UniProtKB/Swiss-Prot annotation:
Gene: NLP3
GO cellular component: nucleus
Subcellular localization: Nucleus
Function: Probable transcription factor.
GO biological process: regulation of DNA-templated transcription
Amino acid composition bias (Low complexity), ranges on this chain: 604-622, 655-667
Principal localisation: nucleus
Designated name of the protein: Protein NLP3
Superkingdom of origin organism: Eukaryota
UniProt GO molecular function: DNA binding; DNA-binding transcription factor activity
Residues in PB1 domain copies: 673-759
Parts forming coiled coils: 485-506
PANTHER family: PROTEIN NLP3, PROTEIN NLP8
Disulfide bonds: none
Amino acid sequence: MVGPFKKILHAHNQRFPPSSSSSLDPVVDDSSRKQTRIILSYLLHLSLSLHITYSLCLLHFFFGSSNPFSPMEESNNSAVVDFPDNFMDQLLWEECWEEEATQHDQALSSPSGLKERVACAMGHLQEVMGERELLIQLWVPVETRSGRVLSTEEQPYSINTFSQSQSLALYRDASAGYSFAAEVGSEQLVGLPGRVFLRRMPEWTPDVRFFRKEEYPRIGYARRYQVRATLALPLFQGTSGNCVAVMEMVTTHRNLEYASQLSTICHALEAFDLRTSQTSIVPASLKVTSSSSSSSRTEVASILQGICSSHGLPLAVTWGHQDSSSCLSALISASYAADHGSRCFLAACSEHHLLGGEGIAGRAFATKKQCFATDVAIFSKWSYPLSHYAKMFDLHAALAVPILTRGNRTVQFVLELFFPRDCLDIQTHSLTLASQLKLRFQSSPHLMVDDNQIAEEVRDAATPPLTQEDPKGKQVSFSFSSASSLENRKRKTKAEKDITLDTLRQHFAGSLKDAAKNIGVCPTTLKRICRQNGISRWPSRKIKKVGHSLRKLQVVMDSVEGVQGSLHLASFYSSFPQLQSSSSSSFPFINPTQTVHVPPKSPPSSSGSQSSSGSSTCCSSEEQQLGGFQKPALSHPQLLTLSSMHEDQRPVRVTSSLPPLPSATTPRKAKDGMKVKAMFGDSMLRMSLLPHSRLTDLRREIAKRFGMDDVLRSNFSLKYLDDDQEWVLLTCDADLEECIQVYKSSSLKETIRILVHHPLSRPSFGS
């Protein structure tokens, strides 16, 4: 009996190999219990085999055979019974173990079976990855009262550490307290595991600190426990395509090689009947077809080489696509990188797909229009999957130009050009580059650039709406439908286009705040609409500025001996009833060429025409236009009288030693720039804003003064106090220009007051 039993045990071990040792307590307990059940089953089947042997012995006794297992001799009333040599093996295997085998097959697809395979896979991955500090944990959907959520509590995990630090263990404990949405429409947080589970696509980042809090709710714990790179993979059951769990891998250092390691990870998982996304994770090289021929790539590469060299561009990425796909992949052979950082970013581009609408390249591909962004590094990872790499390698402003085929005018390539880091005027530079590309592609027999386009600015889209609940109870809206967010942006753009110049003129008499309220938009949107129509300053503010300048001018004139009462400039503003009317079709402005001279102190003597000491001033303003509408010259009786005087009666221009008055169009301190007072929490500092400074320069200086690290720099926001005593958000260079102009042209102090806000800091409201 020992021989058959050994054969049975050996066959069972070959068919169902025991789980390898693991440090996972839940898995070890389940495995121990199952092994106990198997041993008891062995004993039961052994007793059954003994019972069968005893029965055969009884048969032998009655039939009189010397060997119960040998063929029986023929008799008149008996039949020959032949027991083969492997009779006992067949008996025990086919009948005794059939039910156990069926139960084990069912266990492979059960949660406990998944845990065992994942536990074995985790141990194997720790050896394959070779990371000195690595946490692998499993997120499994569970049913709760609030719905189906992803949880890692009481699920397998593995920690590999060679240091005394307990940071990964503490981060594991913190993660166990979180649950994420496992179905669309859930009120739970989405987070990284939720996005991977719902999208069924892997996601990774070189540094989790680049995430926003709404994208990665555990960002606070990640910073505290020095967590850096992370990779999350969806796990599928066999070939069914159903996502059954999410495996998350976390390290304490930055990792730029996850994409290259994905192939190894996938093979390691397949050894345990675990599979990840069926979609290609790393973009495969595009097939050379009619839509993406090698000759076209060579032509594009040559043009990019010339453009980047002549304009000093650090990077230019060529994106291509398959004929039947809207997914963009980087074409390395047709791209250009000038330095090491650009080459690293280009390598990251080769490891990512861009779907329609993602980044400015995806937006240009979807709309067939040129797009530019002042800073792609501040985009969310949902809006631009490469935003974290842009932060790492200091890439900001970029322009995307779709390259069309001459025949059917379909998009064949998208060129993404990154501007130099010291480029100030992004929009002008975009127009120049687009014009140069158009000229260079004119000689191409197959490719072209649309010559009837003006690049539109793309800002970071809000994270797509899918209702979530913040840990503090605040509702946050998210969605995994990029089409809905794109539709909202289109609707908003259409509403802005409906506001014409005539509509704006009807509200010129009031303040900007009242006009925005009456039109039905926010003040920031109204300012943007005004800039699109050529209005750099809301007229009522400009009139107040001119009136204030005239009053200051009157004070200077009155201080000059002999000119008191000769000309009252302070009454100009009150003398224009048209300024208070909103029904006027044209709005009066001061003519930029109109000049007011101060009359001499006394009539010229008979001995000659001698100029006396006086003051000569000129009231002029920068020429303004409203969308091509030229503002009419000022028609006022006093000015007409001055212009119609006889040449001998006209005021004489005199010189003065008084310092010139500050002009509204020049900075008060051209050398030192504007003074800035920045407040961050309970801290405050003063600094100078140099002329022509960009918002990125201001953010960088503020972050440096307050001692912020790279992650904090990318997450804080700035607001300035405007002339309506409201905090207005600074999001781009145009907002910064608006801020400077408000302080220059209003009665505010010369020091710009800026509020620095960070999601993890307590709000500060300066007085």
